[in-house]
Design a protein with these regions (language model features):
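Active-site-adjacent substrate-binding region
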Residues: 240-256, 263-265, 312, 322-374
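A non-catalytic alpha/beta surface segment that caps or lines the substrate-entry region
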Residues: 27-73, 77-83
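His/Asp/Glu-rich mid-to-C-terminal helical/loop segments that flank catalytic regions of hydrolases
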Residues: 8, 37, 236-253, 288-300, ...
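Short pre-catalytic strand/loop immediately N-terminal to key active-site residues, enriched for Gly-Thr
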Residues: 133-141, 348-352, 382-383
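Midchain, well-structured core segments that form catalytic/ion-binding scaffolds
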Residues: 123, 129-142, 176-305, 311-313, ...
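Active-site metal-coordination/substrate-binding segment of hydrolases
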Residues: 71-168, 173, 193
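N-terminal capping segment at the start of a domain
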Residues: 5-33, 133, 225, 321, ...
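Flexible, glycine/charged-enriched surface loops at secondary-structure junctions
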Residues: 24, 56, 163-168, 251-265, ...
Length: 409
């Protein structure tokens, strides 16, 4: 391997020590001031490598690695996000390295929280490898600090080995990807790449150029509260309206769907007798099917409202991101270039669609074609997240192979 295992692991551990949880309740970019800490650290490290790097007013980090020899090649962008998911704590992450010999891995001090192949069958693939795991109280942050570390280690390798030929490389690190806003203020024109890759995938080999179309929805339920002792025929309980609404939807949920099947996902609920609110995300690979899901919400609300003299349920839908496939169908040489790089390293590309989204989806629709590459981590967004060290090294090796090989038109 050309990439230093010791260096990239130290780099990853340094980055996950900084809390960068994004905040979905904030309208600012970045949504959390904590994201600045990693942004400034990355900018400092890039400049220490002798590269031109900057952080803009919205916490986007960009840098350039000038071409060496291969000046006629397209400018390739490499992008990862700095924030971690608000689904689990990212504060005071205490990673540890274990040599996995099979069976269960105790995460917490008492051994009551364990990472096991019974819960996560893919774990068995990593017998004999070193894994970075959590202490059972936080997520790890491999999503996407593994991608950040892989890109930074590539930059370190190329700047310490100036004899290696490569084309011009643009580096971008974004805030707020986990709350769907990572690419919204990204300066595509200023980035000036011909195409790019996000490094935000999971297991070794993942190469993704298709993702969900996505929308979110807020369902507001208006009740009528009176004293429960005199409520017959009068009280309308907003929480029961909410329960009725959710139970009426098709049973197409994350826990019951797979592959190319879309879903309705209830992500939050709150309420009193007077007012209740449901938050959903809607996902589908087919844009028309996503529109049908939106219509289903409206029809469900209308059906419940028809039982009352007043409009008791209102639905607000917001589009989030679109499937990048419609952009990349005409630029498949970008996907092929990455696939060929993987194959030269003995990796079989895995081209299954992303049951989620990446910054690359939005960037592709903004004119920067941007498929997604693996970063190596697994079980994102929770305490069972882990990162096989060989996978992290291979992510950086793949980037090195991509940027040092001529792109075929």
């Amino acid at each position: 391997m050309r990439i230093s295992k010791e260096s990239i692991v130290k780099r990853f551990l340094r980055y996950v020590s900084l809390e960068t949880t994004s905040d979905p309740s904030s309208e600012e970019t970045p949504s959390s001031d904590k994201e600045w800490d990693l942004a400034h650290l990355l900018c400092f490290e890039l400049r220490s490598m002798g590269l031109a790097a900057s952080v803009d007013d919205h916490c986007y980090v960009t840098a350039t690695i000038p071409a060496v020899g291969m000046t006629s090649q397209p400018v390739i962008g490499l992008i990862a996000h700095m924030d971690t998911s608000p689904d689990a704590s990212g504060r005071n992450v205490k990673p540890r390295i274990v040599h996995y010999e099979g069976g269960e891995i105790p995460l917490d001090e008492t051994g009551t929280i364990t990472l096991t192949p019974q819960k996560f069958p893919e774990l068995i693939q990593y017998v004999g490898q070193e894994l970075i795991v959590t202490d059972g109280t936080t997520l790890l942050g491999a999503d996407d600090k593994a991608g950040v570390a892989a890109i930074m280690e590539l930059a370190n390798h190329l700047t310490t080995h100036p004899e290696i030929p490569h084309g011009e490389i643009r580096i971008g690190f974004t805030p707020d990807e986990e709350i769907g806003r990572g690419a919204s203020l990204f300066d595509v024109e200023g980035f000036a790449a011909d195409f790019a890759y996000t490094v935000d995938g999971g297991a070794v080999g993942e190469l993704q150029y298709e993702n969900f179309n996505a929308a979110s929805a807020t369902i507001h339920c208006h009740g009528l509260n009176v004293h429960p002792g005199d409520a017959k025929g009068k009280m309308i309980n907003a929480m029961r309206l909410a329960m009725d609404f959710d139970s009426t939807l098709p049973d197409q949920r994350p826990s019951t769907t797979e592959g190319r099947e879309g879903f309705y996902h209830l992500t939050a609920m709150s309420g009193t007798v007077e007012e209740a609110e449901l938050e959903y995300i809607l996902r589908d690979f087919d844009s028309e099917a996503l529109e049908e899901r939106k219509d289903t919400l409206l029809r469900t609300a209308a059906a419940i409202n028809s039982r009352y003299d007043d409009e008791r349920i209102t639905v607000t839908v917001r589009d989030q991101y679109r499937n990048m496939l419609e952009c990349l169908l005409y630029r498949m040489e970008i996907v092929d270039h990455a696939a060929e790089a993987m194959k030269r390293l003995g990796i079989e590309p895995i081209t299954s669609p992303i049951r989620g989204g990446t910054d690359g989806a939005t960037l592709s629709h903004r004119g920067l074609p941007c498929p997604n590459l693996f970063a190596g981590g697994l079980n994102f967004h929770g305490i069972y997240e882990y990162l096989p060290i060989p996978s992290l090294v291979m992510a950086a090796e793949t980037l090195l192979e991509i940027v040092t090989t001529e792109v075929r038109s």
